[in-house]
Amino acid sequence: MSEQPILQVESVSKRFGGVHALENVSMDLFPGEVLALAGDNGAGKSTLIKVISGVHHADEGKIRYNGAEVTFENPQKAREQGIETIYQDLALADNLDVGANVFLGREPMKRVFGLPVLDRKKMRSEAADALRVLDIRINRFDLPLRSMSGGQRQAVAIGRAIHWNAKVLIMDEPTAALGVPEQRKVIALIKSLKQSGVGVIFISHNLIDIFAVSDRIVVLRRGKKVGETATQATNSDEVVRWMVGG
């Protein structure tokens, strides 16, 4: 693991009216590290990742990326710098195939008889390459995503992030609504990301998954950071106590 954080959150606060959604939160993420972000509903997890990814702007504090202070105007600017977010709904188009989803909004074009048309062959070929890097096997790249399992859909979302050279991947409840076998596949994918040097922020209510995949755990409660530890140095009982304030 690198000694230099790829992402630093420094004393970040965010208010919505009179509500402190985040209050003086700091944390670091290193390349090739899986950092779990734990907390109950309303703890501030979603607000924090939206500040990092450019959806919200912090009222106070700083975000540093590769050592430089950054302010992302919107999520697209964050993606252009290599920060990708996979939300629980995956933001995939069920009626499109794998290649079209990997290139969604960034479709390559070619000219046929002087007219611009989608280069579907390139999209499918490069999508296959991206999934192959993660050892993901999908037999039919020409089928719409609605025909695929939840685990395969999650894999396509991860493959899309890797294809666009993500250096930081934020994953919001990636194993929610999946069966146990598919949860295991997603955990294996996250471990593959770690091996490739991607820094992963892993948001989950599932402590079993957190302990299976993370290197460190940060716990939020009511907008404040109340705990941070190496995963191997704690247990689920301690994490739950931090979450509920016991």
PLM region spans:
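Glycine-rich phosphate-binding loops of nucleotide-dependent enzymes
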Residues: 2-246
